[in-house]
Amino acid sequence: MKTTTMSQLRQWKQEKRKFATLTAYDASFAQLFAEQGIQVLLVGDSLGMTLQGFDSTLPVTVADVAYHTRAVRRGAPHCLLLADMPFMSYATPELAFTHAAELMRAGANMVKLEGGSWLCDTIRMLAERAVPVCGHLGLTPQSVNIFGGYKVQGREEVAANQLLQDAIVLEQAGAQLLVLECVPVELAQRVTEELTIPVIGIGAGNVTDGQILVMHDALGITGGHTPKFSKNFLAHSAGDIRAAIKLYIEEVEGGIYPAEEHTFQ
């Protein structure tokens, strides 16, 4: 099996070929996802909520993400593997480099940072030191206390224009990938068309280059409230996890998921 690379993702964008990605936290699920055809995985700081039982991602540490990154890498050696930089782990460019190096040594191919234009110096420094970076705009969970909860971002014209400008400058600074979370579909389309780098959406409609879901949402095992954009693929697959993942991939690649009911206007 060939290893998935960023050049492939860029080619898929040019070919308008949509791709499906998932979070993963252990070797067993990583292997299962890869065997069904998932080629991009994220060790998300969402592990704080899905695995550790916290009500936000803020308590997650670099050591936590590194531990799970090592496990996922062993389970899916050929996937393009992203790892989240946790809250306050990239407060300065120097701190970001130290922690990014730890995650890269753990097996990540790329690190993901949440934030706008204020991150440009950090992204530039990492890119110059051979650390690939994925940006993250829209609803950035590490900023939940500023946002006042998990709310759709970019609905007002000023906020939408600022998000688009942030996306442009992050790409100019050296970001190779962008996650866009919980934004209106029209804004997601503007960002996806404006950037030359691939854009992965979550709660951003079916107009982005790729889609990502937290694995617990995709399999319907999230306790309590589930996001509007999530879909329980396991419930549509007679309880067969492998069939659920294949269905997820098929619906993303076919532009079926996310549907209008999963989309913010």
Swiss-Prot record:
<dbReference type="InterPro" id="IPR015813">
    <property type="entry name" value="Pyrv/PenolPyrv_kinase-like_dom"/>
</dbReference>
<keyword id="KW-0566">Pantothenate biosynthesis</keyword>
<comment type="subunit">
    <text>Homodecamer; pentamer of dimers.</text>
</comment>
<dbReference type="GO" id="GO:0005737">
    <property type="term" value="C:cytoplasm"/>
</dbReference>
<keyword id="KW-0479">Metal-binding</keyword>
<dbReference type="GO" id="GO:0003864">
    <property type="term" value="F:3-methyl-2-oxobutanoate hydroxymethyltransferase activity"/>
</dbReference>
<protein>
    <recommendedName>
        <fullName>3-methyl-2-oxobutanoate hydroxymethyltransferase</fullName>
        <ecNumber>2.1.2.11</ecNumber>
    </recommendedName>
</protein>
<dbReference type="GO" id="GO:0015940">
    <property type="term" value="P:pantothenate biosynthetic process"/>
</dbReference>
<comment type="pathway">
    <text>Cofactor biosynthesis; (R)-pantothenate biosynthesis; (R)-pantoate from 3-methyl-2-oxobutanoate: step 1/2.</text>
</comment>
<feature type="binding site">
    <location>
        <position position="84"/>
    </location>
    <ligand>
        <name>Mg(2+)</name>
    </ligand>
</feature>
<dbReference type="InterPro" id="IPR040442">
    <property type="entry name" value="Pyrv_kinase-like_dom_sf"/>
</dbReference>
<keyword id="KW-0460">Magnesium</keyword>
<comment type="function">
    <text>Catalyzes the reversible reaction in which hydroxymethyl group from 5,10-methylenetetrahydrofolate is transferred onto alpha-ketoisovalerate to form ketopantoate.</text>
</comment>
<comment type="similarity">
    <text>Belongs to the PanB family.</text>
</comment>
<dbReference type="Pfam" id="PF02548">
    <property type="entry name" value="Pantoate_transf"/>
</dbReference>
<feature type="binding site">
    <location>
        <position position="112"/>
    </location>
    <ligand>
        <name>3-methyl-2-oxobutanoate</name>
    </ligand>
</feature>
<keyword id="KW-0963">Cytoplasm</keyword>
<keyword id="KW-0808">Transferase</keyword>
<feature type="binding site">
    <location>
        <begin position="45"/>
        <end position="46"/>
    </location>
    <ligand>
        <name>3-methyl-2-oxobutanoate</name>
    </ligand>
</feature>
<dbReference type="InterPro" id="IPR003700">
    <property type="entry name" value="Pantoate_hydroxy_MeTrfase"/>
</dbReference>
<dbReference type="GO" id="GO:0000287">
    <property type="term" value="F:magnesium ion binding"/>
</dbReference>
<feature type="binding site">
    <location>
        <position position="45"/>
    </location>
    <ligand>
        <name>Mg(2+)</name>
    </ligand>
</feature>
<feature type="binding site">
    <location>
        <position position="114"/>
    </location>
    <ligand>
        <name>Mg(2+)</name>
    </ligand>
</feature>
<feature type="binding site">
    <location>
        <position position="84"/>
    </location>
    <ligand>
        <name>3-methyl-2-oxobutanoate</name>
    </ligand>
</feature>
<feature type="active site" description="Proton acceptor">
    <location>
        <position position="181"/>
    </location>
</feature>
